[in-house]
């Protein structure tokens, strides 16, 4: 039974060690409020995606709410004509998507003349922005870019050719400029090749559902997935599937899209819902620092509901993956639930874990999370060390080998190395032993050396999210030199000054960049609390709360 928390401070305890530091009422209230807010959210806290919304505009003219989507499309175009967030190379795919959608609407001719004029201007500026982009890579490692980019370039050329032949109903005499060249590093034949490959097999793997729009036009009808809700949790994939059908979209498809559009004023995120990812990452961030007693029952329910002995999916319709599976095991342990490691076994390849079975590129952070799950499980169940001990040692060595010489780790899920480095350092500090000391210290030195003048950290510019990760890296070492103290003090000031200062920059990789706001808030909240309590780690709370087993 869970006791009533002290009105000033409270500590959550379970049979699994958690934070035992002094916790301010403000932190406890904020953390509990964040958990409660997430629990009431049926989709997850991400912003609309320009790329995704433009794909729905292009493929689903029958879906109510198009005027709002067009307003969003026009409003989101940058002064240089591009769309999207992040540096210019990240803007390639959203700009292709925006241009193609505007061309599709102009060809249909169902918009008011003023809207058509604005769309034509957006096309002209967008094509100019595409011509100004670099001609070759390296390009970001975002989801299925190797299929999505060539497919959209081909669609733009097709739209331009049809407008040249037929014109646009609302704009006499307007013609778009030349279509974009396919950037170096992409293969124009790949979408058709992938479709042909699986047509010969007779089935389409689930891994293509989330990015189905990239190959939808190349597949035979027999390979079109038939699912009742959003295909691969993606509005764009769902709209593309409906566009390939010979009949009108089903009521279920329309309802699934409308339910998401209602949340986003007609627009769409790249994945919905993201509840599994959001809840696991938020729970882990708070539990590693301090999980308020008021939030414990909710987080325990999340952990119990999400854990699956067959493996965990990050969202409905996606493949099972080692990252979410490891986090489900880890979060369960942090809140005193005992779940086995067996679901992770299917992803083990002999030296480390594949994030997906049959994946193209691996994930550092999935393996860092797996190391924490493995290490924690063995500490609680020492009789399993003969089974998992050798695997843990191999995983530790593999993770160390992935470190770059200057100190950071990269990862395919995040544009910033601070995320993967914080995750790797956390795993190696707890479960790497003496073998990991050099790797951790190298990462700490790198973090110290890359702090910005304002006390922040960031790959493109200082952000609160990346500063929270850097704080975790610096606090991982027991050797606190004066340089550490100064860096942490400056970080604490920066995080305090930036609180509530606006939306978080998009740094996470899906098809384009996105920002999982609740998860970011949890990391920042936890980092600020850890910085507050580092000054007096020996203080203890007067009324401990004992978590129910």
UniProtKB/Swiss-Prot annotation:
It catalyses: (2E,6E,10E)-geranylgeranyl diphosphate = (+)-copalyl diphosphate. Pfam families: SQHop_cyclase_C. A motif (DXDDTA motif) lies at residues 321-326. It comes from Streptomyces anulatus (Streptomyces chrysomallus). Keywords: Isomerase, Magnesium, Metal-binding. InterPro entries: SQ_cyclase_C, Terpene_synthase-like, Terpenoid_cyclase/PrenylTrfase. One of its GO terms (molecular function) is magnesium ion binding. Its EC number is 5.5.1.12. Belongs to the terpene synthase family. It comes from the Bacteria. The Asp-Xaa-Asp-Asp-Thr-Ala (DXDDTA) and Gln-Xaa-Xaa-Asp-Gly-Ser-Trp (QXXDGSW) motifs are expected to bind to Mg(2+). GO terms for biological process: diterpenoid biosynthetic process. The keyword Metal-binding applies. This is Copalyl diphosphate synthase. Its cofactor is Mg(2+).
């Amino acid at each position: 039974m869970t006791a009533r928390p002290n009105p000033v401070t409270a500590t959550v305890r379970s049979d699994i060690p958690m934070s035992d530091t002094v916790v301010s009422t403000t932190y406890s209230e904020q953390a509990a409020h964040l958990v409660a807010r997430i629990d009431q959210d049926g989709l997850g806290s991400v912003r609309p995606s320009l790329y995704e919304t433009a794909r729905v505009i292009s493929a689903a003219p029958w879906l109510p709410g198009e005027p709002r989507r067009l307003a969003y499309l026009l409003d989101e175009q940058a002064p240089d004509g591009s769309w999207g967030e992040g540096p210019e190379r990240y803007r390639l795919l959203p700009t292709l998507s925006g241009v193609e959608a505007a061309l599709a609407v102009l060809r249909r001719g169902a918009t008011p003349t003023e809207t058509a004029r604005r769309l034509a201007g957006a096309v002209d500026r967008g094509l100019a922005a595409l011509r100004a982009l670099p001609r070759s890579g390296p390009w970001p490692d975002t989801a299925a870019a190797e299929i999505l980019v060539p497919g959209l370039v081909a669609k733009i050329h097709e739209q331009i050719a049809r407008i040249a032949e037929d014109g646009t109903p609302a704009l006499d005499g307007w013609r778009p400029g030349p279509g974009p060249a396919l950037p170096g590093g992409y293969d124009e034949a790949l979408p058709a090749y992938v479709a042909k490959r699986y047509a010969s097999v007779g089935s389409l793997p689930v891994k293509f559902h989330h990015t189905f729009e990239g190959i939808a036009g190349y597949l035979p009808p027999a390979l079109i997935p038939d699912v009742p809700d959003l295909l691969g949790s993606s509005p764009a994939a769902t709209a593309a599937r409906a566009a390939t059908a010979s009949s009108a979209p089903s009521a279920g498809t329309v309802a699934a899209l409308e339910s998401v559009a209602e949340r986003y004023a007609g627009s769409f995120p790249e994945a919905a819902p993201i509840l599994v990812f959001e809840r696991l990452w938020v729970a882990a961030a708070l539990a590693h620092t301090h999980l308020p007693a008021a939030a414990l029952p909710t987080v325990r329910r999340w952990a119990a509901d999400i854990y699956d002995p067959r493996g965990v999916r990050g969202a409905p319709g996606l493949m099972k993956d080692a990252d979410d599976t490891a986090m489900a095991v880890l979060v369960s342990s942090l809140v005193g639930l005992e779940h086995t490691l067996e679901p992770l076994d299917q992803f083990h390849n002999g030296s480390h874990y594949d994030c997906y079975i049959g994946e193209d590129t691996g994930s550092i952070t999935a393996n860092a999370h797996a190391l924490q799950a493995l290490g924690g499980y063995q500490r609680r169940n020492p009789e399993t060390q003969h089974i998992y001990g050798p695997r843990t040692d191999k995983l530790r060595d593999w993770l160390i080998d992935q470190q770059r010489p200057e100190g950071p780790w990269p990862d395919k899920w995040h544009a910033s190395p601070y995320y993967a480095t914080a995750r790797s350092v956390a795993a190696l500090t707890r479960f790497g032993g003496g073998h990991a000391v050099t790797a951790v210290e190298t990462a700490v030195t790198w973090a110290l050396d890359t702090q910005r003048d304002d006390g922040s950290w960031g790959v493109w510019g200082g952000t609160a999210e990346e500063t929270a990760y850097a704080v975790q890296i610096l606090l991982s070492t027991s050797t606190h030199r004066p340089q550490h103290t100064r860096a942490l003090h400056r970080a604490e000031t920066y995080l305090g000054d930036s609180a509530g200062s606006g939306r978080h920059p998009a740094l996470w990789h899906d098809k384009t960049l996105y920002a999982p706001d609740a998860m970011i808030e949890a990391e920042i909240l936890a980092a600020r609390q850890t910085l507050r309590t580092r000054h007096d780690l020996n203080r203890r709370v007067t009324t401990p709360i004992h978590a129910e087993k």
